């Protein structure tokens, strides 16, 4: 039995010496490698604010203000959208006994209500020439009829061109 115990002790010491030798042999006295520094995130570019608006200095030559239209100053264009004048087709149709719906001279006349006679004639002439009304008629006669229905007069010498 003593030989078993001594054999066990000899094996125990042999293994201890082996492990001690291995640990001493692998110790190289090296410093541990330093931890890598984290890569800094890119800094956002500073936002450039637009420069404050400079106070406007009036120019020495201000733009002329267009004077408001007076009853005698007519231009060559209609201040009303010609497509809106399509309601005047019902007025002409009812006068010619063509039933396209309920005739309403009120709608047509209300469109040209605030215009002088020349402007009203220009607007209706534009609508007739563009055939917005959808009826092929003699333009001077149709123009005169539409103006008369709305209690307007065809200006003397006016040519629907």
Curated annotation (Swiss-Prot):
Subcellular localization, as worded in the UniProt entry: Secreted, Cell wall; Endoplasmic reticulum; Cell junction, Plasmodesma; Plastid, Chloroplast
Pfam families in the cross-refs: Hydrophob_seed
Signal peptide extent: 1-25
Positions with biased composition (Pro residues): 33-70
Region of interest (2 X 8 AA tandem repeats A of P-S-P-K-P-K-P-V), ranges: 34-49
Stretches the record annotates as Disordered: 32-76
Residue ranges of A- repeats: 32-39, 40-47
CDD domains: HPS_like
Keywords: Cell junction, Cell wall, Chloroplast, Endoplasmic reticulum, Hypersensitive response, Plant defense, Plastid, Repeat, Secreted, Signal
Induction: Transient accumulation in response to a brief exposures to cold. Induced by glycerol-3-phosphate (G3P) and azelaic acid (AA) during systemic acquired resistance (SAR) and Pseudomonas fluorescens GM30 strain during induced systemic resistance (ISR).
Superkingdom of the source species: Eukaryota
KO phenotype (gene knockout): Reduced cutin accumulation due to lower cutin biosynthesis. Early flowering in long-day conditions. Compromised pathogen-induced (e.g. Pseudomonas syringae pv. tomato DC3000 and PmaDG3) glycerol-3-phosphate- (G3P) and azelaic acid-(AA) dependent systemic acquired resistance (SAR). Increased tendencies in cellular damage after freezing treatment.
GO CC term, one of those recorded: chloroplast
SMART domains xrefs: AAI
Main localization, broad class: secreted
InterPro entries found in the cross-reference section: Bifun_inhib/LTP/seed_sf, Bifunc_inhib/LTP/seed_store, Hydrophob_seed_dom, Plant_LTP/defense-related
Single GO biological process annotation from the record: plant-type hypersensitive response
Subunit structure: Self-interacts and binds to DIR1. Interacts with PDLP1.
Function of the protein: Probable lipid transfer protein (LTP). Seems to control the flowering process and lignin synthesis. Together with DIR1, required for glycerol-3-phosphate- (G3P) and azelaic acid- (AA) induced systemic acquired resistance (SAR). Component of plant systemic immunity involved in priming defenses in a AA-dependent manner, by modulating production and/or translocation of a mobile signal(s) during SAR. Confers resistance to Botrytis cinerea and Pseudomonas syringae pv. tomato DC3000 and PmaDG3. May be involved in induced systemic resistance (ISR) mediated by non-pathogenic bacteria (e.g. P.
Database matches in PANTHER family: PTHR31731
Family assignment from sequence similarity: Belongs to the plant LTP family. PEARLI1 subfamily.
Protein name: pEARLI1-like lipid transfer protein 1
Organism: Arabidopsis thaliana
Source organism phylogeny: Eukaryota, Viridiplantae, Streptophyta, Embryophyta, Tracheophyta
